[in-house]
């Protein structure tokens, strides 16, 4: 797997681990309130605190799965699937919460998914005989 894609996946996993930290470890802090644009007093409500902590565990799960897909499974398909899921969730959040979520939570994932597709296209071109194979080989050699 491409080192650039691995770096992007690590950054995405770190972002989701940080969200876990905010939502589960310090769910009613001033930092969490600032990041999510909420009042601390609202975050201290037991139902809200429980919901935040639960959501944080899901975010940690995404981070762990992404790291496993990259470094244990070495699966481009699993990575692409997780990135697509992250983008879908960010898109949903941009419609329901704030339009900027697609860039804040999904921006790195969008770039990483584009890298996945670019790499797949180059691999297909390289596997084909003829001019496309030579072009892809040339591009790969220049990296």
Regions found by a protein language model. Name each.
Residues 5-8, 30, 69, 77-78:
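A charge-rich, low-complexity, intrinsically flexible signal that marks solvent-exposed coils, linkers
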Residues 15-18, 22, 34-71, 84:
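Core segments of alpha-helical transmembrane spans in multipass integral membrane proteins
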Residues 3, 43-46, 50-53, 73-77, ...:
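Juxtamembrane loop-transmembrane helix junctions in multi-pass integral membrane proteins
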